[in-house]
Amino acid sequence: ASMFKHDHYMDNGVRYPNGDGICEQLNETKCDAGFSYDRSICEGPHYWHTISKCFIACGIGQRQSPINIVSYDAKFRQRLPKLKFKPHMEKLKTEVTNHQNRAPEFEPEDGENLYVKLNNLVDGHYKFHNLHVHNGRTRRKGSEHSVNGRFTPMEAHLVFHHDDQTHFEPTRTKLGGAFPGHNDFVVVGVFLEVGDDGFGDEPDDEECKRILKGHHPDNNENGNGDNGNNGYNGDNGNNGDNGNNGYNGDNGNNGVNGNNGYNGDNGNNGDNGNNGYNGDNGNNGDNGNNGENGNNGENGNNGENGHKHGCRVKKAKHLSTILECAYRNDKVREFKKVGEEEGLDVHLTPEMPLPPLKNRHYYTYEGSLTTPPCTESVLWVVQKCHVQVSRRVLHALRNVEGYKDGTTLRKYGTRRPTQKNKVTVYKSFK
């Protein structure tokens, strides 16, 4: 997320590294300069700091994001608050447009106010700024963060920016005090899996019109609580989170916490490494073999916590249809729509991408924005439990055009590579 509407990097031509792999530092000072996810050019993520002096933190920062989270190294903090919003379950009118070669953003319309609630960790003045979803160059590795070297196909970010009209209030729960001052942003990250079962038929254009205006054919998936008639996971009928259907995940009866755990996409190698998080610079790059812990994911039977803090993955049906319909719409999908004054109006609840309230265990650390200018003023709240959307969402997002020639976001993705920072990560669960 960025506070700026960036130019397209191709508007000013493309630069390439010299024979020594070095890109010249430009004298540009614009904070809205264009940037790319093409890793072979000087506008790409490894060289963002050379594009503009405003982007210098991208190259020399001390708390850059995203990171690989090593679950057993994260420090448990007993008093970390539950993640909530005020007002609760508020449906917002948002507008989404084509963001060129970047992830489309759902931005609240004027007058729409929603705040993140993390009592004692931050004050109550962080206002909803946008929702966006990152994807990768491959279908399986699209999340920006990873846990123990494992990625998911996408990662949703709910971005909150501190209200400029209010003063920062002191926090009661400090995260080690390594970085003085206040964080301008709170960003909630959610790992998104994809699946086929239980998401119904592909919505047609007429159905999409109704869905984007907030009309859904059945009960709101954010319902009346984990055990109410409609439950937070109302997608599975009247039984809510504790209903008969539960959630069995991609692997049938085993679910995300079953024998197979969650194996991520590409195993143990992280972005570039031959040994997962411990390498990060080795031979196999995106296509490693087994994952740091072999066959059993973090939440599998042999995972870090087994069933004690297991995750029941929510099938986010309504979020799926909203994202699918939005990404398919011409105003978002077509590059030629960039700059048009009228975007696509979408009604959504920012809680839709989140796990059920009782499963909102999270990791938190002080990092940065993952796009230029890579501002180091972000409190990250990365959800441990995953959420599942339909495979059609991933397909639709990857087919959004990011270039004048019709090249889509599938070519370079919209994920920044893992950063090698030694930041301290805390967690709300044992």
From Swiss-Prot:
Record function comment: Acts as a negative regulator for calcification in the shells of mollusks. May function both as a calcium concentrator and as a carbonic anhydrase required for production of carbonate ions, which are assembled to CaCO(3) at mineralization sites. Is important for shell formation in both the calcitic prismatic layer and the aragonitic nacreous layer. Shows inhibitory activity of crystal formation when present in free state but, when attached to the insoluble matrix, may regulate the form and size of aragonite crystal.
Gene Ontology terms: cellular component: cytoplasm; extracellular region
Localization (cell): Secreted, Extracellular space, Extracellular matrix
Name of the protein this chain belongs to: Nacrein-like protein P2
Record has Glycoprotein as a keyword: yes
Source organism of this protein record: Mizuhopecten yessoensis (Japanese scallop)
Binding site for Zn(2+): H132, H134, H157
Keyword tags: Calcium, Disulfide bond, Extracellular matrix, Glycoprotein, Lyase, Metal-binding, Repeat, Secreted, Zinc
Bias kind Basic and acidic residues: ranges: 207-219
Biased composition (Low complexity): 220-304
Chain sites annotated for binding substrate: T370, T371
CDD domains linked to this entry: alpha_CA_prokaryotic_like (cd03124)
Subunit structure comment from the entry: Homooligomer; disulfide-linked. May also be disulfide-linked to insoluble organic matrix.
Catalyzed reaction equations: hydrogencarbonate + H(+) = CO2 + H2O
Further comment: Two hypotheses for calcium binding are proposed. Either the Gly-Xaa-Asn repeat domain bind calcium or sulfite and sialic acid provide the necessary negative charge in the N-glycan to promote calcium uptake.
GO MF annotations, alphabetized: carbonate dehydratase activity; zinc ion binding
Residues glycosylated per entry: N27
Required cofactor(s): Zn(2+)
